[in-house]
């Protein structure tokens, strides 16, 4: 990244290559307002593009931000014909991932085969976060099939997004184990599985796992390509949000996921009218100074505390002006 890049998101708004934009942050920092207003702005500035906002945050504040009820299917935002929103509960998507059934085996890229792996070895289920990561991969697969030009995720800064990036490594290890088991014990395991009521077929299991691995590797390849994917952390100038943002940035760097822009929200004006305001602003000033030092090579967008609630398309559109170049 270059030193002192412009303090706006024009490089994201006008990008002709970006397909995935993640907006994440600690609760209460304005993450959903950011993702929704950015979605409106990109749709407005690029009428030829189909834009989709997906909320994977359990709170699902996107409905509140637009003042429109959204659900698990994409719904067009009135007044913004090329922008749709959907809210997906990752926990709901996780249901059945490890159930011993064939539900979804043919429709979700082969992820239903986990039931077979669970019955065979009982290993995957014990891996922390694996069900969440695989459920998120199903959501990504679903989004790909919808043929939107750009997808914005309103998501928590940690959890399924980052866990998913390590999924191919885990699946590759599991595939190697399956191949070894197949070579050594395939016929015996199939016979034993039949006796125990487990539907295990090594000849079907291996290609299904290979397909699942290939699918997850392709998605991770997209997510680690800065021309296709970027992550925008949102914070407020306080200790915990800054600490969590720095931890997130380091983790994204380790996973080779691009992050070149940061939104700093809810900045108080300089105000000497009361001790509380003065002290609060002094605390913010300290952390704003640290943010400038830490992220001087990022597109750093600083936004003042809003005097009115940002709710509805008109308010989101007005808020989105914070992301544009100042003329």
UniProtKB/Swiss-Prot annotation:
**SUPFAM superfamilies the record matches:** P-loop containing nucleoside triphosphate hydrolases
Keyword vocabulary terms for this entry: ATP-binding, Cytoplasm, Endoplasmic reticulum, Hydrolase, Metal-binding, Nucleotide-binding, Transport, Zinc
GO MF terms, alphabetically ordered: ATP binding; ATP hydrolysis activity; metal ion binding
- Name its GO BP terms in alphabetical order: tail-anchored membrane protein insertion into ER membrane
Q: Name one cellular component (GO) term.
A: GET complex
Per UniProt, ATP binds at: 26-33, 238, 265
Q: Where is the active site?
A: 57
Superkingdom:
Eukaryota
The top EC class, named as a word, is hydrolase
Describe the function of this protein. ATPase required for the post-translational delivery of tail-anchored (TA) proteins to the endoplasmic reticulum. Recognizes and selectively binds the transmembrane domain of TA proteins in the cytosol. This complex then targets to the endoplasmic reticulum by membrane-bound receptors, where the tail-anchored protein is released for insertion. This process is regulated by ATP binding and hydrolysis. ATP binding drives the homodimer towards the closed dimer state, facilitating recognition of newly synthesized TA membrane proteins. ATP hydrolysis is required for insertion.
Show the NCBIfam families listed in the entry: GET3_arsA_TRC40
Similarity comment text for this entry: Belongs to the arsA ATPase family.
How does this polypeptide assemble, per the annotation? Homodimer.
What name appears for this protein in its UniProt entry?
ATPase ASNA1 homolog
